[in-house]
């Protein structure tokens, strides 16, 4: 059985409230809701469900020696990961994010650096805190890795195979965030109201079967950008797949407005 360890990401200028609750059975769909259901069902059906392993995830495998190379991911893995990210953004009414090559390279350097030091599943993996730079990784690449790993990180133990969607969905659901129940930092990055782009990286441990996945989505210009929505709720206020809300999945409300008093939460169907 696969075991996923998730790390909470650093999130700026967003106020987040998380709480646990049981899914609510939906009432009868209106015509517009039924149309939305069919739209999201068709869109999900078209998402690639392919499994990737150490042999198929790379176009070029990393080289953990001189000369260091972070490797190059299979383009299909990158595009599928972004398809899932943008599917989940669409569910809550957010625009799609771009996937520029420079962000992918930074994310891949981050993932390969985690793999090079066989990083343990702990919060110190963010920014590679207390990890020594291998002598075959340049100071410049190490600096890029430190920044890229401040974003979303997923550790998949004994990863003989995994799909791109499996990684993104784990980060979205936040069922097993090692920072503690109720932490929704990964979800907040995926569903950011300011984000415009994301880089994707992944690498198997140099001497383990741990799969390190990096979603590099923290950029200074995005953080300073005006939000496209003032609030995000999970599950979404409109139709929402019940598969994304398990018994351990924290529900959440995120807003760009500061909340100074104890809020009251009402759940209505």
Residue ranges of model-derived segments:
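Secretory-pathway/luminal and periplasmic proteins that interact with or process carbohydrate-rich
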Residues: 110-128, 137-139, 198-200
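Intrinsic-disorder/low-complexity regions
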Residues: 3-4, 129, 134, 140, ...
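Long, polar/Ser/Thr-enriched low-complexity segments
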Residues: 78, 85, 132-138
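Short coil/turn segments at secondary-structure boundaries
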Residues: 53-62, 121-132, 187, 191, ...
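A well-ordered secondary-structure block
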Residues: 27-31, 133-215
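N-terminal targeting leaders of exported, membrane, and organelle-targeted proteins
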Residues: 2-116, 196-197, 203-269
């Amino acid at each position: 059985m696969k075991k996923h360890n998730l790390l909470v990401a650093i999130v700026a200028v967003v106020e987040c409230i998380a709480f646990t609750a049981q899914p609510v059975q939906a009432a009868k769909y209106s015509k517009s809701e039924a149309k939305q259901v069919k739209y999201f069902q068709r869109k999900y059906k078209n998402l690639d469900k392919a499994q990737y392993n150490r042999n198929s995830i790379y176009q070029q495998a990393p080289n953990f020696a001189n000369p260091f190379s972070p490797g190059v991911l299979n383009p299909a893995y990158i595009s599928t990961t972004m398809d899932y990210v943008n599917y989940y953004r669409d569910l809550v009414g957010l625009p799609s994010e771009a996937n520029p090559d420079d962000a992918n390279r930074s994310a891949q350097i981050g993932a390969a650096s985690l793999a090079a030091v066989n990083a343990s599943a702990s919060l110190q993996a963010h920014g590679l805190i207390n990890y020594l730079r291998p002598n075959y990784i340049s100071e410049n690449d190490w600096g890029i890795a430190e920044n890229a790993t401040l974003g979303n990180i997923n550790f998949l133990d004994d990863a003989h195979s995994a799909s791109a969607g499996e990684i993104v969905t784990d980060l979205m659901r936040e069922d097993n965030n090692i920072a503690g129940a109720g932490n929704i930092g990964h979800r907040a990055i995926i569903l950011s109201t300011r984000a415009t782009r994301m880089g994707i990286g992944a690498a198997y441990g140099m001497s383990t079967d741990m799969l390190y996945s990096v979603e590099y989505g923290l950029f200074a210009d995005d953080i300073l950008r005006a939000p496209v929505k003032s609030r995000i709720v999970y599950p979404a206020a409109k139709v929402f797949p019940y598969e994304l809300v398990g018994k351990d999945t924290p529900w959440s409300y995120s807003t760009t407005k500061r909340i100074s008093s104890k809020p009251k939460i009402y759940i209505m169907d």
